[in-house]
Amino acid sequence: MMDSRLKLIQDWLLQLLAEMTVSDPDGNEHEVFLVDIEVHSNKTIDIIEVFADTDSGISVENCKFLSKHISAELDASEEMQALLPRHFKLVVSSPGLSRPLTMNRQYKKNIGRLMQVTYQNADGEIKTIDGRFISLEEEAEASITLDITKIQKSKPNAKPKPPELVTIPFSQIQKAIVQVEF
């Protein structure tokens, strides 16, 4: 697919989702935001994958609602019909844990979780570290802070280690992925 076509579809979806809200089981409304869109084409069909979220997470029911709404709007839009002249398949889902974080909103909702961050340090070296994401700085130079203190099984009467904190500016982050904890 041409990049300009993808950009037009993405802009259209951003505008469509800009004012969208979904409800949680308690009836509270949550603003939807678009995390990413991927469009794949094969010989007979275009596949549009929409990765959406809310600040409090997104449910399967929310994704089903969004899918129906987006599909109806795509079908009704002459602009989208021109960009998608053949059959398309729409897939709406959460970004999931395997996708890197790309937006401040995603970072905010993951404070306190384990993360793996790949970044370029001041010397130009690419480093990957694991740590507990403890803070997000959005003022001045945006950055995240991780506690990279190794979690070790406690020995009786052992002194806990002081936290070892690493602050990484957003401009140096290449990939940040939330880790699954059991």
Swiss-Prot record:
A GO biological process held by the record: ribosomal small subunit assembly
Keyword Ion transport attributed: no
Domain of life: Bacteria
Location of this chain's protein in the cell: Cytoplasm
Keywords of this entry: Cytoplasm, Ribosome biogenesis
Main location: cytoplasm
Any one of the GO CC terms: cytosol
Coiled-coil portions: none
Keyword Cytoplasm tagged: yes
Function: Required for maturation of 30S ribosomal subunits.
Similarity comment: family membership: Belongs to the RimP family.
Protein name as it appears in the record: Ribosome maturation factor RimP
Source organism (scientific name): Chloroherpeton thalassium (strain ATCC 35110 / GB-78)
